[in-house]
Regions:
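N-terminal catalytic or cofactor-binding beta/alpha core of small enzyme domains
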Residues: 1-102, 113-122, 142-177
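Active-site glycine-rich loop that binds ribose-phosphate moieties when present
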Residues: 105, 109-111
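Short coil-to-beta-strand
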Residues: 123-127
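An accessory alpha-helical subdomain
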Residues: 129-134
């Protein structure tokens, strides 16, 4: 199920929560457009902080918490190593990124992880930044649409595979050492 969220402070959170409530997904993969050059960035951490203007230009925040009672940060619950390895195997430039900034992308990542931790147990959440599409007139190297779509599909497939794996307890893990 694909849904587009507006780049508007807290409206994106309200809609994200409404979509999660409506569809009750087992995973939420959010995708944002990142930099004008590759690689794909697998975001590892969502922080409870937002700063900067939104696309309306009406709201400009400075280091405001997304959820005032929430923890400082959450780690993505996606299989980031499997996603990274798969994209590398596909020849798609990729790297880990350890925080999604303080903008809307981070707001969406943190919100999805917070909702998973507080209301939707068992739901996994993560975020990837894909490069902009190439634009020679603007001097943007970017990444072509085919590679971008392939990167997103590979990440969805790896996240879905992880959902099917049985979860082992720490005791079960230790027994296999």
């Amino acid at each position: 199920i694909k849904r587009e969220l507006p780049v508007v402070w807290f409206e994106c959170v309200r809609l994200l929560e409404a979509y999660i409530e409506e569809f009750r997904p087992r995973m939420v993969l959010s995708v944002g457009q990142g930099y004008p050059i590759p690689p794909v960035l697998i975001e590892r951490i969502g922080i409870n902080l937002c700063s900067g203007p939104d696309n309306t230009g009406e709201i400009d925040l400075y280091e405001e918490p997304i959820f005032p009672q929430g923890p400082a940060a959450y780690f993505s619950t996606f299989p980031y190593q499997a996603m990274h390895d798969r994209l590398q195997a596909e020849g798609i430039p990729v790297r880990y990124h350890f925080e999604a900034g303080q903008n809307q992308c981070n707001c969406v990542l943190y919100s999805a992880l917070h909702l998973a931790a507080t209301h939707y147990s068992g739901m996994t959440a993560g975020f990837i930044h894909v490069p902009m599409l190439p634009d020679s007139e603007k001097g943007i190297q970017g990444m072509n649409l085919e590679h971008t779509a392939r990167a997103i599909l590979c990440c969805v497939e790896e996240a879905a595979k992880a959902l099917r794996r049985p979860v082992r307890t720490l005791e079960q893990y230790r027994e296999n050492l």
